[in-house]
């Protein structure tokens, strides 16, 4: 079960823009991430590689946690992301992340957002 302090540290790393570093530091080796109903990606190394590839397509990433809840091993975070592609196109969207933690590390995460609502 994550402490509030641990969750706040995780959020701070993501908000700093170090998304791949957050995965390296706060996810279990066998962690999984799932976007909406897509098949999950599994394994911390896979998750880090995917995140680095996504970030490489961006010139700027803004991440802000609007609220977060901890209930035992379960965490919910409401995120606002603003992604600026290298072409200058800006995409902004709201996302809810549901996480399951093992101690102070995330082992399962699922993201919920409306892809049609990604504003360009």
Predicted regions and their residues:
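Short, aromatic-enriched amphipathic alpha-helices that serve as compact interaction elements
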Residues: 1-18
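A solvent-exposed, acidic/Ser-Thr-rich amphipathic alpha-helical stretch
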Residues: 6, 20-73
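A short, polar/proline- and glycine-enriched secondary-structure boundary/capping micro-motif
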Residues: 45, 87-90, 118-120
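Short, cysteine-centered beta-strand-loop-beta hairpins and adjacent loop/turn segments enriched
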Residues: 57, 83-92
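Short, surface-exposed coil-to-beta transition loops
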Residues: 61-64, 78, 91-97
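Hydrophobic beta-strand positions in extracellular immunoglobulin-like domains
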Residues: 81-83, 101
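Short beta-strand edge/turn micro-motifs at domain boundaries
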Residues: 94-120
